[in-house]
Amino acid sequence: MFENEFMKITVAGVGCGGNNSVCRVADAKPTGITYFGIDTDSKALRSQAVTPVHLGGNHSSGRGCGGNAALGKAAAEENYEMLLSLFQDCVVAFIAAGLGGGTGSGAAPIVAKAAHEAGALTIAVVTKPFAFEGARRMTTADEGLEELRKYSDAIIIIPNENVRSSTTQKITFANAFRLIDDVLCESVLSVLEILTKAMLINIDIADINAVLRNSGDIFIGNAVAEGTDRVNKLVASVTNNPLLEKGMNDAKGLVVYLSANHNVSLDEINEISNKISETTAPDANIIWGFDFDDSLGDMIKVSVIASGVK
């Protein structure tokens, strides 16, 4: 459970894929977060947990964009003042979208522009299409991503195709989308936890801004490990997220949040921190936080956010 009483944090889904992911985040029930589902298709805006925002007007009659990103962009631009009002006084804004379709690729960059203009730290979390969806949809996704980069401080990219290459086992189509949604949801929740949780060694919004503002592509990893070799297991797991497009090698900025019970040794904390830091650039800006959590038992938990990744 995440509780936030100190800053306005907004999570906005744009298009069908983005809205589905935002609903997953809302289902985790972090408090003090504002959720919007933004779409040109009025039928898609039916979640009780998320406030619906319909991009209507001359460019959309409530029936979507038919894969036309230009229509999605025009619909968002026509409603720009309304979008700007959604992010008034917002400190951190997450923009979730599935790229390749008309609304996600066309409208998401304009939504990010509104969040950025309102002064929010703007973090985009996006997916790219499967290869079987065709070259045209991939081109639309790539063009949307380039527009999104103009207005986002940080971007997490999840290529759907990585689901196939990340496992040797057969996976159902439904489970593939669940995995993709899980990565997107966990990425958002990780940042929310770091921002909103009171820690023994604290990480605040100024720290997050220092690492993520105007940072470009970022990597997010989460892991827990227990047992005799838990340090090596933890580091190997948290520094490798095969579903993301970018790894964390040579990162220019790094946020590390560790939690463990009161029996964790200083040597273990030191070893974990050093091993994770070894993956970054020599002059990386590293910000570190820690909190005790006896509910973890023998487990150590770590979350990392790496910026300026290649």
Regions found by a protein language model. Give the residues of each.
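Tubulin/FtsZ superfamily GTPase core signature
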Residues: 1-310
